[in-house]
């Protein structure tokens, strides 16, 4: 890691929190992909996939919640910049072998800073929404493995999580 990457950019010289000034950075295409999952009982996963939970269509509600969360990240994470997102999507993939529902969010913008936090927030809120809608039938659910998978654009360039 270079010395520049070892600095905590959200702290000033006195150690106080600050929002990073991105005013001099070029506007470039940015993209981030994040993933996470909700592990649950096999019966709960079946209820979700069959659309038979009492609270309604879990995946539709969680998808909208994740997209809304991406758009509101700057209100939730104190030092994040408000970004004009051009794309936000949330996808779900059942993994019966792990009794899990995989969540993937992709976020894009033309901007001066990345959209990693927006993608991570989308996954997190989608997972929490799934938990909320299913907790009456499964209190053992576990949210885990929320992580950045890839980012594209910006001064630091492209990055892909090693497999």
UniProtKB/Swiss-Prot annotation:
Keywords: Lyase, Molybdenum cofactor biosynthesis. The keyword Lyase applies. It catalyses: (8S)-3',8-cyclo-7,8-dihydroguanosine 5'-triphosphate = cyclic pyranopterin phosphate + diphosphate. It comes from the Bacteria. The keyword Transport does not apply. GO terms for molecular function: cyclic pyranopterin monophosphate synthase activity. GO terms for biological process: Mo-molybdopterin cofactor biosynthetic process. Its EC number is 4.6.1.17. Substrate binds at residues 79-81, 117-118. InterPro entries: MoaC (IPR023045), MoaC_bact/euk (IPR047594), MoaC_sf (IPR036522), MoCo_biosynth_MoaA/MoaC (IPR050105), Mopterin_CF_biosynth-C_dom (IPR002820). Pathway: Cofactor biosynthesis; molybdopterin biosynthesis. The active site is at residue 132. Homohexamer; trimer of dimers. NCBIfam families: moaC, PRK09364.1. Belongs to the MoaC family. Catalyzes the conversion of (8S)-3',8-cyclo-7,8-dihydroguanosine 5'-triphosphate to cyclic pyranopterin monophosphate (cPMP). This is Cyclic pyranopterin monophosphate synthase. It comes from Chloroflexus aurantiacus (strain ATCC 29366 / DSM 635 / J-10-fl). The lineage of its organism: Bacteria, Bacillati, Chloroflexota, Chloroflexia, Chloroflexales. The gene is moaC.
